Design a protein with these regions (language model features):
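Structural beta-alpha unit
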Residues: 1-4, 74-124, 162-208, 213-214
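Small/aliphatic-rich secondary-structure junction motif
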Residues: 2-69, 135-184, 199-203, 207-214
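Short beta->alpha connector loops
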Residues: 17-19, 107-110, 131, 145-146, ...
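Short beta-strand segments
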Residues: 43, 127, 187
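Flexible loop residues that form catalytic
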Residues: 47, 129, 189
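Short, basic, helix/turn surface patches
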Residues: 66-74, 130-131
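Charged linear interaction tracts used for macromolecular binding and regulation
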Residues: 96-100, 120-123, 127-139, 143-145
Length: 214
């Protein structure tokens, strides 16, 4: 028996920079348009940057493993520019489909914010794929092809002109690493903690969607 994907009460799009948010906006707008759900963009500030004082340097790592060292002032300017670009692109995309939208800035790592901000009925997307459009299949991690996450992945793939694929719920993050994943859909029936979520994001290198619960 096929389980229809539940409608989203609200669609949250989280990203730590505009480059990661950009490719995920199309996915977020497509999901929100499904049920006319309000769309909320959240720029996630690195908590290490906020903890730095004065001109103290902040270090971090990108997906490629290179270490970044920037001043707090320069990082603040970059976040301000990202916030403007993120909000502008989100507003334009939402306005084109007459969707309600809002934007805010919060602090924290993406997995922690996703699990902390999510409320019952919310769909949460974590944007992660630098500069690249969505091209690979939309993959659902779910046991069986008729569950709500699998059905949602199929609907989104069809709307985006992509393929859909279902992998077992217990698929380890390292199995996603070689796959050209366009987006990853996770059922909320799967227990996803912040550590596993971070590992899945890093391995898939694509937008990750926590599907709304029923």
């Amino acid at each position: 028996m096929t389980a229809d994907p539940p409608p989203a009460r609200r669609v949250l799009l989280l990203a730590s920079c505009f480059a990661d948010a950009g490719p995920a906006i199309r996915l977020a707008v497509t999901l929100a348009a499904r049920t006319r759900a309000p769309l909320e963009g959240v720029l996630a500030l690195d908590p290490r940057a906020e903890a730095a004082e004065g001109a103290e340097l902040v270090t971090g790592r990108r997906a490629a493993g290179a270490t970044l060292v920037v001043s707090r002032e320069r990082l603040s300017l970059a976040y301000a520019a990202d916030a403007r670009a993120f909000r502008s692109r989100l507003d334009r995309a939402a306005t084109a489909l007459a969707l309600r939208t809002s934007f805010r800035i919060d602090s924290g790592a993406l997995p922690d914010l996703a699990l902390g901000l999510r409320q019952p009925g919310d769909a949460v997307i974590m944007g992660y794929r630098r500069f690249l459009p969505l091209r690979g299949p939309v993959i659902a991690l779910e046991d069986g092809e008729n569950g709500p996450a699998a059905q949602l992945a199929t609907e989104l793939a069809r709307a985006l002109g992509l393929r859909a694929r279902v992998l077992p719920a217990n698929t380890p993050p390292e199995a996603l690493d070689p796959l050209p994943v366009g987006a990853l859909v996770l059922s909320q029936a799967i227990h996803v903690d912040a550590v596993r979520l971070a590992a899945l994001i890093d391995a898939a290198r694509c937008p990750v969607l926590l599907a709304p619960d029923g």
